[in-house]
């Protein structure tokens, strides 16, 4: 079991160093691997690493929340009812209420509304907080289609990349402790598609095979390059966002987020998913043929 665990961490690209030195602690030497003292030392190190990671994560979250507070304070003066509706939408009713407020101020305070939308979307994506699907729908209600699509793709790409960097900085203990088995399996898939990684990321973003939050937090651990990750995400979220944005043009006719997706749109998404992975398949077949 221990050997399997070591192998899994090796596949995930984990690197561990053991400090060696003199002094009071050095007089008794390092504990032998597998001994009770060694297990205690390992537990202390892991516990300290987890606490430090949590402290850094909380600090970053509070800093981001403060930025969101400043964005909100820079918003125009709102009535009591409007302030109540200025929240991250959890259902379609919340989205409609928020859309009503934003559309009222969008023309007069265009930059403030755009910055608030941009910052909120990235905040949700960075910390894997649910609600971005409703913001995608709202973009179709608030802005022309080309701008809405670019805005959603950019926010998704940046937010996911910030989540990637956050995981790279403090998320490794979480991945190692809770997601090791799944991350190892995905690491094997990534290695299999290493030559066509952008196509593979696009495919994953279009299809529902892996949750977006899982892709975001495990990618740095299994050595997916950030540039490839961003480009694949930016392009991969476009087809699903297209569906959500088009639904936003009829926002007040929707009662649930599920109504934004029709069987026709699902069929189109599946076709686009297949097309995204075809170049990799064809190149692999040609390579095998010539070899």
Swiss-Prot record:
Protein name, as recorded: Transmembrane protein 41B
Annotated catalysed reactions: a 1,2-diacyl-sn-glycero-3-phospho-L-serine(in) = a 1,2-diacyl-sn-glycero-3-phospho-L-serine(out); cholesterol(in) = cholesterol(out); a 1,2-diacyl-sn-glycero-3-phosphocholine(in) = a 1,2-diacyl-sn-glycero-3-phosphocholine(out); a 1,2-diacyl-sn-glycero-3-phosphoethanolamine(in) = a 1,2-diacyl-sn-glycero-3-phosphoethanolamine(out)
Residue(s) carrying Phosphothreonine: 18
UniProt GO BP: autophagosome assembly; intracellular lipid transport; modulation by host of viral RNA genome replication; nervous system development
One GO molecular-function entry: phospholipid scramblase activity
Species of the source: Homo sapiens
Membrane-spanning segments: 52-72, 109-129, 147-169, 197-217, 225-245, 262-282
Gene Ontology cellular component annotations, sorted alphabetically: endoplasmic reticulum membrane; mitochondria-associated endoplasmic reticulum membrane contact site
Any matching Pfam family: VTT_dom
Family of this protein: Belongs to the TMEM41 family.
Subunit structure, as described in the record: Interacts with VMP1. Interacts with COPA, COPB1, VDAC1 and ERLIN2. Interacts with ATG2A. Interacts with SURF4.
Cell location: Endoplasmic reticulum membrane; Endomembrane system; Cytoplasm
Function, as annotated: Phospholipid scramblase involved in lipid homeostasis and membrane dynamics processes. Has phospholipid scramblase activity toward cholesterol and phosphatidylserine, as well as phosphatidylethanolamine and phosphatidylcholine. Required for autophagosome formation: participates in early stages of autophagosome biogenesis at the endoplasmic reticulum (ER) membrane by reequilibrating the leaflets of the ER as lipids are extracted by ATG2 (ATG2A or ATG2B) to mediate autophagosome assembly. (Microbial infection) Critical host factor required for infection by human coronaviruses SARS-CoV-2, HCoV-OC43, HCoV-NL63, and HCoV-229E, as well as all flaviviruses tested such as Zika virus and Yellow fever virus. Required post-entry of the virus to facilitate the ER membrane remodeling necessary to form replication organelles.
Disordered as annotated region, ranges: 1-39
Domain note: The VTT domain was previously called the SNARE-assoc domain. As there is no evidence that this domain associates with SNARE proteins, it was renamed as VMP1, TMEM41, and TVP38 (VTT) domain. (Microbial infection) VTT domain is required for flavivirus infection.
UniProt keyword annotations, A-Z: Autophagy, Cytoplasm, Endoplasmic reticulum, Host-virus interaction, Lipid transport, Membrane, Neurogenesis, Phosphoprotein, Transmembrane, Transmembrane helix, Transport
């Amino acid at each position: 079991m221990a050997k399997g665990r070591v192998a899994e961490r090796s596949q995930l690209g984990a690197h561990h160093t053991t400090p060696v030195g003199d002094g009071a602690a050095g007089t008794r030497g390092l504990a032998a691997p597998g001994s009770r003292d060694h297990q205690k030392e390992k537990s202390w190190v892991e516990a300290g690493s987890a606490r430090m990671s949590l402290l850094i994560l909380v600090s970053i979250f509070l800093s981001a929340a403060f930025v969101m507070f400043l964005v909100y304070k820079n918003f125009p003066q709102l009535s009591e009812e409007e302030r109540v509706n200025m929240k991250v939408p959890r259902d379609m009713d919340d989205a409609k209420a928020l859309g009503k407020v934003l559309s009222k101020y969008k023309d007069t305070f265009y930059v403030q509304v755009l910055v608030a939308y941009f910052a909120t979307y990235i905040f949700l994506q960075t910390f894997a907080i649910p609600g971005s699907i409703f913001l995608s729908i709202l973009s179709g209600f608030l802005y022309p289609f080309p701008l809405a699509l670019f805005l959603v793709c950019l926010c998704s790409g940046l937010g996911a990349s910030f989540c990637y960097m956050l995981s790279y900085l403090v998320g490794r203990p979480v991945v190692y402790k809770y997601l090791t088995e799944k991350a190892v399996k995905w690491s094997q898939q990534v290695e299999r598609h290493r030559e066509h990684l952008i196509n593979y990321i696009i495919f994953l973003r279009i299809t529902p095979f892996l949750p977006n939050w899982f892709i975001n937090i495990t990618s740095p651990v299994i050595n997916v390059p950030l540039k490839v990750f961003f480009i694949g995400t930016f392009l991969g979220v476009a087809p699903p966002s297209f569906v959500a944005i088009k639904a936003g043009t009829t926002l007040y006719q929707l009662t649930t987020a599920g109504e934004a997706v029709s069987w026709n749109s699902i069929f189109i998404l599946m076709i686009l998913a297949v097309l995204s992975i075809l170049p990799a398949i064809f190149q692999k077949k040609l390579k095998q043929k010539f070899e």
